[in-house]
C-alpha cells in the first residue's frame, strides 16, 4: 500500500528565502493567523527552505553564524577572477555582510542559461541574486560566446498595482526562480517570480505575488522592458496567505514552421488552501505582452491512485511540483513534472513518479498524464547528517562528517530530438538507479515518521547509495516512455566513468545539440575525495543514441567546497546549460571564493576596518556563491 504523505509545500528557488511567514486560510469562522513554521505539517516542514525553518523554527540566524573568534585577517578584496577555463559570470566584488546575515547581500545561485538561435555568440544567464540584501532576479549576458560577461539589471522594483487593489504601483520585496529563453527572432525572455514577505518578516501584511516576464529586444540581454508583463498575479494585500504560486519555468516555441511559432509558455505549481498542488500553464501569442488564463495540466489519471485530498477538484493528480515545459517542431507543447500521488508496493518502497502531458492546440487543453518513469528522492537530511536541515532532503557525503546539508531535490527536464520530432528525452535524478540499489547495499527503507523524508540503508556507506541522472525516452510523441514500464534500476544513466558509478550526481541540466546529441550536465562528486568530503565538481556527458552515455568531461578546474552561505542550507534548486553548435555552456553556482567579514575589533576608533575570513556553520573557511561557466565540447 502507499505510504501516505501529506501534501508537500514544495516551496523552492527564490521562495526559499523570501516568503517569510506565509499564511493559509483557516477554517470558516476563524480569523486568519500567521502561517509560521510550527503550523506546518512535518512533511511541509521537510520541503520549505532550510533558512526559513531556522528563522521561524526558533534557531535563528545568529545561532549558526560564524563565531567572530574564528575570523582571521586576509588581504583579498573579494573580487574573484576566472579560474583557468572557468569564466566568472557575475561581475561584482563581494559585499561584506554581518556574520548573522551570511549570504544576504552576497550570494548568487540557482542558474538558468539560454543562447540566441540566430547568433550563438549571444548568451543570457539568469540566477537568484542577493547582492541587494534580499533575493532578486539577477541577469548577466555575453556577446562573445560565453568568454566575457557583463551584468544587467532586471527592472523589477515594482509592477503595476492594477491587480493589487488598484494603486498605481505594487512594490515587491523579493524575487527569483529565473528561467531564460529566446524566440526565433532574436528576442530574449526572462521569467521571474516576485512577491511580498508579509507581516512575519516586515511591518507590511501584504503577501501578494505573481509571475512576470521581461523581454530584451535588440540588446541581447543588456536591457529589458519595464514593467514586467504579468502571467498570473495573486492579490493578497490583506495577508490572508490563502495559496502560494511557486516554481515557474518557461519555454518558447522555436519551430520555424510551427503554427505557434514564438509562443511563450509558463508552467508552475499552485499550492491551494484546499490542500492541492496542481501544475498550471499559461501562454502568450504576442511576444510576452499578454498571457492567457491559466489551464490545469496535472488533471486525472489512474496513475494517481493516492490523491492528497478527498475532493481533488481538478483530478486525482493533485500533489505535484517541478514542472518543465518544452516544445516540438510541429508546435506540440509537452509538460513534464514530478508527481507524488502514485501507489507503492509496501515495505520500504518510497518511490515517486514523473508524469507528462501534451497540448496540440497551443496550451489551451492537455492530454491525460502519462508515466515517464519512477524515481526515488534524495534522502532525509536530518536522519543522516546529525539532525541538520530537518524536514529537508539533501546530498549527504559518505563517512562521519556532515558538511553537505543544503536542500536538494530530484526534478525532471524534457526536450525533443531535433532529428526526430516524435522522439522525446526526459532526464531526472533518482537515488535508486542501476548503480545504486539493493545489490550494492542501498535499499529503500520507507519514510521518516518524524519528517516524512525518504530513508535508505547505505546512505553514509562508500560504494552503496548515490544519486544518478537517469534517462527515459519516447519514440511515439510522448504516448509511452522506456521508463513507463521499466524499473528505474534498468534505465540508462548519464554517468559512465568508474568514479561516477559510485558517487553522487545531482542538480542536473540537459539540452539537445543541433545534430541530435543529448548533452547532460550535473554537479558531480566523482573526483578526488568529493564523495567523502562533500565537495563537488561539474561534469558534462553526451549521448548520441539515447541509450548510453560517454564523452564525460570534468568542467571545473578544481573541486568546490560545501556551500556555507545561508548557514549551509541553500544552494539554489536547479542548474541548466546551453548548447550552441557542438559547444556546451554549463552555468553553475560556485563556492571556491572565500567569504569575507569585518575583522573583530576593527572599524572602531583608532582601528581602521579590515577584512577577515572565518568559519562557516558547516565548513571552514566560509565561502561565497558566485556564478561561473565554461565552454566544453558537446560532440
Predicted features, each with a name:
Residues 18-40:
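C-terminal region of N-terminal signal peptides and the immediate post-cleavage residues
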Residues 1-13:
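Bacterial N-terminal signal peptides that target proteins for export
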Residues 11, 17, 24-28, 225, ...:
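Compositionally biased non-globular segments, especially hydrophobic aliphatic-rich helices
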Residues 33-635:
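C-terminal PAP-associated
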Amino acid at each position: 500500500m502507499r505510504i501516505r504523505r501529506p501534501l508537500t509545500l514544495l516551496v523552492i528557488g527564490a521562495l526559499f528565502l523570501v516568503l517569510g511567514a506565509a499564511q493559509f486560510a483557516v477554517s470558516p469562522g476563524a480569523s486568519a493567523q500567521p502561517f509560521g513554521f510550527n503550523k506546518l505539517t512535518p512533511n511541509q516542514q521537510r520541503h520549505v527552505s532550510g533558512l526559513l525553518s531556522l528563522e521561524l523554527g526558533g534557531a535563528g540566524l545568529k545561532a549558526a553564524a560564524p563565531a567572530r573568534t574564528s575570523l582571521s585577517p586576509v588581504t583579498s578584496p573579494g573580487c574573484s577572477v576566472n579560474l583557468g577555463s572557468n569564466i566568472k559570470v557575475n561581475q561584482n566584488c563581494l559585499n561584506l555582510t554581518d556574520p548573522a546575515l551570511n549570504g544576504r547581500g552576497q550570494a548568487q545561485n540557482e542558474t538558468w542559461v539560454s543562447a540566441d538561435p540566430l547568433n550563438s555568440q549571444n548568451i543570457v544567464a539568469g540566477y537568484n541574486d542577493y547582492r541587494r540584501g534580499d533575493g532578486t532576479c539577477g541577469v548577466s549576458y555575453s556577446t562573445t560566446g560565453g568568454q566575457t560577461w557583463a551584468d544587467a539589471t532586471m527592472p523589477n522594483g515594482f509592477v503595476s498595482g492594477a491587480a493589487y487593489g488598484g494603486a498605481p504601483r505594487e512594490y515587491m520585496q523579493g524575487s527569483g526562480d529565473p528561467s531564460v529563453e529566446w524566440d526565433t527572432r532574436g528576442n530574449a525572455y526572462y521569467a521571474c517570480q516576485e512577491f511580498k514577505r508579509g507581516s512575519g518578516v516586515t511591518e507590511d501584511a501584504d503577501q501578494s505575488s505573481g509571475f512576470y516576464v521581461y523581454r530584451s529586444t535588440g540588446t541581447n540581454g543588456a536591457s529589458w522592458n519595464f514593467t514586467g508583463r504579468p502571467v498570473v498575479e495573486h492579490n493578497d494585500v490583506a495577508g490572508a496567505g490563502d495559496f502560494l504560486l511557486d516554481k515557474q519555468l518557461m519555454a518558447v516555441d522555436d519551430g520555424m514552421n510551427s503554427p505557434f511559432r514564438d509562443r511563450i509558455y509558463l508552467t508552475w505549481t499552485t499550492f491551494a488552501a484546499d490542500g492541492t498542488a496542481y501544475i498550471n500553464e499559461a501562454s502568450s501569442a504576442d511576444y510576452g505582452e499578454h498571457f492567457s488564463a491559466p489551464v490545469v495540466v496535472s488533471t486525472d489519471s489512474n496513475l494517481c491512485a493516492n490523491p492528497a485530498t478527498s475532493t481533488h477538484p481538478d483530478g486525482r493528480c493533485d500533489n505535484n511540483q517541478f514542472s518543465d515545459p518544452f516544445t516540438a517542431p510541429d508546435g506540440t507543447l509537452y509538460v513534464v513534472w514530478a508527481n507524488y500521488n502514485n501507489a507503492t508496493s509496501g515495505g520500504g518502497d518510497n518511490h515517486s513518479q514523473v508524469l507528462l502531458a501534451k497540448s496540440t492546440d497551443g496550451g489551451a487543453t492537455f492530454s491525460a498524464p502519462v508515466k515517464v518513469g519512477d524515481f526515488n528522492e534524495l534522502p532525509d537530511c536530518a536522519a543522516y547528517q546529525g539532525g541538520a536541515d530537518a524536514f529537508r532532503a539533501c546530498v549527504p557525503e559518505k563517512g562521519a562528517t556532515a558538511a553537505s546539508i543544503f536542500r536538494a531535490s530530484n526534478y525532471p527536464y524534457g526536450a525533443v530530438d531535433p532529428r526526430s520530432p516524435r522522439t522525446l528525452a526526459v532526464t531526472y535524478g533518482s537515488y535508486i538507479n542501476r548503480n545504486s540499489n539493493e545489490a550494492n547495499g542501498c535499499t529503500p527503507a520507507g519514510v521518516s515518521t518524524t519528517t516524512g523524508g525518504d530513508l535508505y540503508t547505505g546512505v553514509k556507506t562508500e560504494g552503496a547509495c548515490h544519486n544518478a541522472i537517469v534517462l527515459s525516452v519516447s519514440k511515439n510523441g510522448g504516448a509511452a516512455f522506456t521508463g513507463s514500464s521499466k524499473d528505474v534500476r534498468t534505465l540508462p544513466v548519464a554517468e559512465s566513468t568508474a568514479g561516477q558509478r559510485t558517487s553522487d550526481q545531482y542538480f542536473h541540466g540537459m539540452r539537445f545539440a543541433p545534430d541530435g546529441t543529448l548533452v547532460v550536465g550535473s554537479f558531480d562528486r566523482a573526483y578526488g575525495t568529493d564523495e567523502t568530503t562533500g565537495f563537488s565538481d561539474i561534469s558534462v556527458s553526451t549521448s548520441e543514441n539515447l541509450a548510453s552515455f560517454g564523452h564525460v568531461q570534468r568542467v571545473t578546474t578544481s573541486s568546490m567546497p560545501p556551500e556555507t552561505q545561508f548557514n549551509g542550507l541553500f544552494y539554489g534548486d536547479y542548474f541548466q546549460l546551453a548548447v550552441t553548435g557542438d559547444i556546451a555552456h554549463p552555468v553553475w553556482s560556485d563556492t571556491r571564493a572565500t567569504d569575507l567579514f569585518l575583522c573583530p575589533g576593527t572599524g572602531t576608533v583608532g582601528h581602521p576596518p579590515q577584512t577577515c575570513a572565518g568559519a562557516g556553520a558547516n565548513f571552514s573557511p566560509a565561502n561565497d556563491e558566485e556564478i561561473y561557466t565554461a565552454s566544453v565540447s558537446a560532440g
